[in-house]
Amino acid sequence: MKVLIVLTSHDQLGDTGRKTGFWLEELAAPYYTFKDAGAEIVLASPKGGQPPLDPKSNEPDFQTALTRRFEADAEANAQLARTVRLDSVSQADFDTVFYPGGHGPLWDLAEDRDSIALIESFIAADKPVALVCHAPGVLRHVKAATGRPLVEGLQVTGFTNTEEEGVGLTQVVPFLVEDELKANGGHYSKGPDWGSYVVRDGLLITGQNPASSTEAADVLIRQLTIH
């Protein structure tokens, strides 16, 4: 099993002057879920190299056993420091792709032509795609084979409007994930704020928030083993 994990290269939180990037738990949890299942993992980002970590995601309140494991893992950190460029990867080399969130993807991956084409290619090849938290927002321009939005008519979830309000960034983000999924015709559902909630519809797996990262990765592995 070979898994591609796609991370953001964007580090500016709108015009706030604050830093953003990927959310550590949303990388660490699937990374070890896949690694412990024996998968080969490749990390990619639009710019390649070291992707920006949202500094808030490594504060004590947001650390988990898996984020601490990642922080202490020299091999994982070396791999993170040298992510491959997104425009150099091919769907044909992987069984699946997983997108961690953090606010960064709303600015770069959501508009990135290589990312859009990559997701479309995985779906066309009948391979599952998983995205958690803000990452379902990167589906905003992704099309199905029909030319319609990929999420149209599908069961989906993602970071809720109330969760965005809870972190005080409703007026900062370029769009709200919940609203965007609904606008593209997705059948959006959600669980309680900050609790694990994962939805699978065919090849598409979406998770609501950081707490959903492990469950989303588990669902993805099950999908691969029965697919």
Regions found by a protein language model. Give the residues of each.
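Extended, subdomain-level signal for the structured scaffold at the beginning of enzyme domains
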Residues: M1-A125, G137-H227
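Active-site cofactor/cluster-binding pocket
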Residues: P128
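Catalytic, metal-anchored helix/loop core of enzyme active sites in primary metabolism
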Residues: C133
